[in-house]
Amino acid sequence: MNNKRTFFQYVIPSVLSFALSGVYAIVDGFFVGNSIGDAGLSAINIAYPITAVLQSVGTGIGMGGSVKYSILKAAGNEKKAREFVAGATWLMLLFSAVLTVTVFFTSEKILSALGASGELLTLGNEYIKVIALGAILQVFGTGLVPFMRNYGGSLWAMIAMICGFATNVALDYTFVWVLGRGMYGAALATIIGQGVTMAVALVYCAIKKNLTLKIAPVDTPKTAFQILKIGLAPFGLTLAPNISLVIINRFSVYYGGQEAIATYACISYIICIVYLLLQGVGDGSQPLMSQFCGAGEEKSLKQTKTLAYEFSMVLAVISAILIYLLRGKIGLLFGSSAEVNAGVIKVMPIFLVAVPFDAITRVSTAAFYATEKSVLSYVLTFIEPIIMLVLMLMLPPVFGGQITIWWSAVFAKVITASVSIVLSVRYSAQRNR
């Protein structure tokens, strides 16, 4: 098998799919920002982590189930592999129901905890109520895509995402600009777009005859535990930019106010697309790494990891250069004020420093959960926000204000990447013994 050709057949569609998933948030920000202004943009920025939780739950469950599916199938245990498809489907149904009820009835309290108040709270609550009602569409829209990739359907996974994205854009234009439905319209466009992705994914899985709910009751708890054990890392990795968003927003409220929040809203919309591109490399190569792990093909596994690191670094550098050159247009894209746009021009280069380091971390994390090294993937996933929080508590009072909030986020990524290199080298040495 030509590993390089196969690698890109899996990874390119995955990268494009993740890019589109990042653009979902940008679409809402673009239409709302140009319709309502800085207040609407800030409200979307504060509320979006809740949406991200729903999507990350789907990604985590889907990735956990699909990793086990690929490893077991490669080892020749087709029957057991299908049980993990069923287990993941039941988990997505369960979590969808729980999240719908929880988010809908506690949305105002959650938004307040995220730093929203006054007009931002009102606008954010209008957005999240609708998102909560469409939780099942978000969870399944993101949760079925990893299975499509592991069934060999990376291209169809991309097509599903494109269909959802196109629907989202068309409906955002219609609901927000033409009909003037504001936050409500943006949220409705988002969940319908995810619903279209879910529909395409369901049809594909049904055609492949890999859509099943059949699992022995006695095996259900163990299967669910194994799915969640692996899925916790991709859940956290998908959510990580939004955890950072929450932390940065909370400190920015104190040090920089609404202008700083709006500035980071513009930055985060763009920078998160880059992070998702890099995650697309890791998750796109996951089916191959899981298959090679299950089949005991160590040489092919190593080659796949190397290709993933190289390709993610190339993407990181190219993306950082392009964003730096175009940074003066970013604030204007979202209809921000002149002050906010000036802030974006000044602050964006700081965040671009961290992009190559994030490339290392995301591929390392994906490699760990693809080969069932869950604990190591947890370390890389959750150490970054912890380091960031500690730095933001320590540095601003000593060195001064909002600028150290920005740099704390960068330092956290540099430290996490350093840890990922150490863990990856040690893990590779253990496998080669």
Which residues make up each language-model segment?
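Short alpha-helical transmembrane segments in multi-pass integral membrane proteins
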Residues: 1-14, 69-136, 178-232, 289-354, ...
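N-terminal transmembrane alpha-helices
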Residues: 2-36, 49-64, 68, 93-100, ...
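Transmembrane helical elements of multi-pass membrane transporters/channels
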Residues: 9-28, 130, 141, 164, ...
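Transmembrane alpha-helix boundary and packing residues in multipass membrane permease domains
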Residues: 14, 18, 30, 34, ...
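Helix-terminus/linker motif at the lipid-water interface of multi-pass membrane proteins
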Residues: 23-42, 111-118, 174-181, 242-269, ...
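Alpha-helical transmembrane segments of multipass membrane proteins
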Residues: 26-30, 101, 143-147, 169-174, ...
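Small-residue-rich hydrophobic transmembrane alpha-helices
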Residues: 41-101, 138-157, 263-325, 358-372, ...
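Short runs within selected transmembrane alpha-helices of multi-pass transporters and secretion channels
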Residues: 62, 131-149, 157-168, 186-201, ...
